[in-house]
Amino acid sequence: MDSEFFQPVYPRHYGECLSPTSTPSFFSTHMYTILIAIVVLVIIIIVLIYLFSSRKKKAAAAIEEEDIQFINPYQDQQWAEVTPQPGTSKPAGATTASAGKPVTGRPATNRPATNKPVTDNPVTDRLVMATGGPAAAPAAASAHPTEPYTTVTTQNTASQTMSAIENLRQRNTYTHKDLENSL
């Protein structure tokens, strides 16, 4: 008998089906997606670090050059004409009739103390808006015509605030907490 006749006949692809094939790994199929995600995350982190460092530098420079106006609406006004009322305390920066310079050491401006509200000051502008706008200012002024400024002693006095501000000015680095505490 011929041996070719008894040879088993297999389909052509049958051998390929029997050979073991490995499924590709997750990393090999998604390699480019993972690499792009890593690059994007690194870029985002670099941008955030740059933004926060520049904000910190700007805040430190602003405090150093006194571009930030600290909340003290009395610091630019002369207090020579104002007599102290009994039972009230004067804010930091106020002078007595005999003193020529404010307590803070800043030179006094030529702006006299009047019943007119201070303009171009964001703190007093917000206070005027909160108390009823410009119409409320004349009513408040007519209620106490002889007392242009009345101060109330609170737990956080102006002298404590000024000492905190002076401490901040003497330091080289500042944090958000420092800026919040100074205001």
UniProtKB/Swiss-Prot annotation:
<keyword id="KW-1043">Host membrane</keyword>
<keyword id="KW-0945">Host-virus interaction</keyword>
<dbReference type="GO" id="GO:0055036">
    <property type="term" value="C:virion membrane"/>
</dbReference>
<comment type="subunit">
    <text>Interacts with the host light chain cytoplasmic dynein DYNLL1; this interaction is critical for intracellular microtubule-dependent virus transport toward viral factories.</text>
</comment>
<keyword id="KW-1177">Microtubular inwards viral transport</keyword>
<dbReference type="GO" id="GO:0043657">
    <property type="term" value="C:host cell"/>
</dbReference>
<keyword id="KW-0426">Late protein</keyword>
<dbReference type="Pfam" id="PF05568">
    <property type="entry name" value="ASFV_J13L"/>
</dbReference>
<feature type="compositionally biased region" description="Polar residues">
    <location>
        <begin position="111"/>
        <end position="122"/>
    </location>
</feature>
<feature type="compositionally biased region" description="Low complexity">
    <location>
        <begin position="130"/>
        <end position="143"/>
    </location>
</feature>
<feature type="transmembrane region" description="Helical">
    <location>
        <begin position="32"/>
        <end position="52"/>
    </location>
</feature>
<dbReference type="GO" id="GO:0044167">
    <property type="term" value="C:host cell endoplasmic reticulum membrane"/>
</dbReference>
<keyword id="KW-1035">Host cytoplasm</keyword>
<protein>
    <recommendedName>
        <fullName>Inner membrane protein p54</fullName>
    </recommendedName>
</protein>
<keyword id="KW-1176">Cytoplasmic inwards viral transport</keyword>
<keyword id="KW-0812">Transmembrane</keyword>
<feature type="region of interest" description="Interaction with host DYNLL1">
    <location>
        <begin position="149"/>
        <end position="161"/>
    </location>
</feature>
<keyword id="KW-1133">Transmembrane helix</keyword>
<keyword id="KW-1037">Host cytoskeleton</keyword>
<keyword id="KW-0472">Membrane</keyword>
<dbReference type="GO" id="GO:0046718">
    <property type="term" value="P:symbiont entry into host cell"/>
</dbReference>
<dbReference type="GO" id="GO:0019031">
    <property type="term" value="C:viral envelope"/>
</dbReference>
<dbReference type="GO" id="GO:0044163">
    <property type="term" value="C:host cytoskeleton"/>
</dbReference>
<dbReference type="GO" id="GO:0075521">
    <property type="term" value="P:microtubule-dependent intracellular transport of viral material towards nucleus"/>
</dbReference>
<comment type="similarity">
    <text>Belongs to the asfivirus envelope protein p54 family.</text>
</comment>
<keyword id="KW-1160">Virus entry into host cell</keyword>
<feature type="region of interest" description="Disordered">
    <location>
        <begin position="81"/>
        <end position="157"/>
    </location>
</feature>
<comment type="function">
    <text>Inner envelope protein involved, through its interaction with host dynein, in the intracellular microtubule-dependent transport of viral capsid toward viral factories. Seems to induce caspase-3 activation and apoptosis. Plays a role in virion morphogenesis by recruiting and transforming the host ER membranes into the precursors of the viral envelope. Involved in virus attachment to the host cell.</text>
</comment>
<keyword id="KW-0053">Apoptosis</keyword>
<keyword id="KW-0946">Virion</keyword>
<keyword id="KW-0261">Viral envelope protein</keyword>
<keyword id="KW-1038">Host endoplasmic reticulum</keyword>
<dbReference type="InterPro" id="IPR008385">
    <property type="entry name" value="ASFV_p54"/>
</dbReference>
<dbReference type="GO" id="GO:0016020">
    <property type="term" value="C:membrane"/>
</dbReference>
